[in-house]
Structure formats: structure tokens, C-alpha cells
Amino acid sequence: MQNRNTFFGVKQQITRFISVSIGIYVITQTSISNAYPIFAQQGYENPREATGRIVCANCHLASKPVDIEVPQSVLPDTVFEAVVRIPYDTQVKQVLANGKKGGLNVGAVLILPEGFELAPPDRISPELKEKIGNISFQSYSPTKKNILVIGPVPGQKYREIVFPILSPDPATSKDVHFLKYPIYVGGNRGRGQIYPDGSKSNNTVYNATSAGVVSKIVRKEKKGYEIIITDPSDGREVVDIIPPGPELLVSEGESIKLDQLLTSNPNVGGFGQGDAEIVLQDPSRVQGLLFFLASVVLAQIFLVLKKKQFEKVQLFEMNF
């Protein structure tokens, strides 16, 4: 009986260990693969503030360019491309969470007009699938299918991201009209400087939290530094903790001021936002325009023929 209980206890411990290990793995992988979109999705109902600012800029403090290209106009119920370009120098390396250097990832958020959404797979042509590559898009939330997010994905391969978009049809959706609509985009390259809870990442600059003398610098194995700042007037000590990644700019015995830079700024990435306009074109207007252009061309042809006929009559009368 005792052996049976012992075996059962060992079995329970093994099962618990496996469950915890799987849980940690899943959480870790999820946080790595979905870091950029999740930060915005968890904290903001809408990624674009009333001021027009996209919330990704709250964590990615450096400003970098981003570009978007869409057709000037589209017909209803049509699949088209929205191309987002996130340029950066692929030779540069960023500071990773463990303090080592690595390549930059990119991420993007595309804010479409109401009614526009990600094209279903069966509507995407093979040519467009080849342009998209091996990446997947997701809606910002179940109620906001017009807002698409992606990332992080390797920047070396996806500095240009092609979104397959399906235009709405006013005939089936009463809230959609044949108008000119704005499209907004935000794109980042590299890690952010601030986490959603307000704490700093190791991909930013660190400042002194007190004035005084750097009495000691303790290097923590794989954990950065502890900088001990002593106030000469009363001997009070303040410890500033620097994570692995940023390079120190101060040394022991150096006098420093409040907010003085303790490290360099390791950030090589940044965030940018842009916009474009697209017209949802009424097919009947297009047909009317084509009919008008055809009428103009025919009128010109008849005018030329009439002119030549008149010239022939004049020439005949002169000869007669």
C-alpha cells in the first residue's frame, strides 16, 4: 500500500512538472511572437487616439519613417494590395532582452475605413499570396475587423509588408458609401523603450536618479550593473540599476549631476506613422465616364470626317 502511494505521489509530481513546463513555454513563446500587437491590444480599445497619434508611439519613442501605397480607387467587393514599407539599415543590430545584439524585427498596424477588412484566403490570387509571403495577419479585436496588426516579423525579410484587403459593397452594407476614405498606418522597427506599465526596457538610455559621486560600480553577472551614488554632504547612498545592454558612460570616482546620462542610448529602431486616401468607386459612374469618353472620341472622329468632306467639296467647286 505504501509503495502504491509513493508511486502515485511521484506520478503527480512528474505530471505537475510537465504541466508547468508546457505552460511556461507557451507563455514565453506567445510573448515573443505577439509582443508588439499584444501591448497595444491589451491596453487600448482603439490604437489611434483622438489626436491622430497611434499608441505604438508611447513605447517606441524614436521617430522613423514609414510609407504606405494603395490604389487611388477601387471597385466594391474587390481585393487590392496595401503595401507598407518600413525602411531601415539592415546592417545595424539592436540590443535584445538578454543584452546581446541581434537583428531587428518589424511590426505594423493598418487602420482601414469601416467596412474594409482582410481578404479571405479563397479571394487571394496565387500572385498576391506569393507577394504576402509566409506571414499571418490578425484583426485588432473581434469588433474591429477593419484594423489589422502584424508582428513582430523578421525585418530582414519583411521591410515591405503586403496586406490583402477586401473592399466593401454598398449594395449589401448600408453603412458604406461611394466616397473618398482615409487609411492610417503605423510601423516600427526594433524593440520599444518603455513597457506598457511604464517601466524601461534595456533598449533605452538611463539617467542618474541622484546627484553625487559614483562611489562604486558593481557588475552583475548577466544582469547589468549597480551604480552606487554617494551624496558627499550626508553620505546617503542611492543605487541605480542598469540592465544588460546599454554601455556605461560613467566611472568610479566621477561626480555626476541629477539626470546626467549614465549610459549611451542603444536604440537603433523607431516608430513612424502615415496615411493615404482611397476612393470607393461606383461602377455606374465608371461606366458613365467610359460612355462619355467614347462619345467624345466618336464626336472627334465625325468632326474630322466632316472637315475632310467639306475640304473635298471646296476643292471640287474650285476646280469646277
Swiss-Prot record:
PANTHER family: CYTOCHROME F (PTHR33288:SF10), PTHR33288. Belongs to the cytochrome f family. One of its GO terms (biological process) is photosynthesis. GO terms for molecular function: electron transfer activity; heme binding; iron ion binding. Heme binds at residues 36, 56, 59-60. Component of the cytochrome b6-f complex, which mediates electron transfer between photosystem II (PSII) and photosystem I (PSI), cyclic electron flow around PSI, and state transitions. Its main location: plastid. PROSITE patterns: CYTF. Residues 1-35 form the signal peptide. Keywords: Chloroplast, Electron transport, Heme, Iron, Membrane, Metal-binding, Photosynthesis, Plastid, Signal, Thylakoid, Transmembrane, Transmembrane helix, Transport. The 4 large subunits of the cytochrome b6-f complex are cytochrome b6, subunit IV (17 kDa polypeptide, petD), cytochrome f and the Rieske protein, while the 4 small subunits are PetG, PetL, PetM and PetN. The complex functions as a dimer. This is Cytochrome f. Pfam families: Apocytochr_F_C, Apocytochr_F_N. Binds 1 heme group covalently. It comes from Lemna minor (Common duckweed). It comes from the Eukaryota. It is found in: Plastid, Chloroplast thylakoid membrane. Its cofactor is heme.
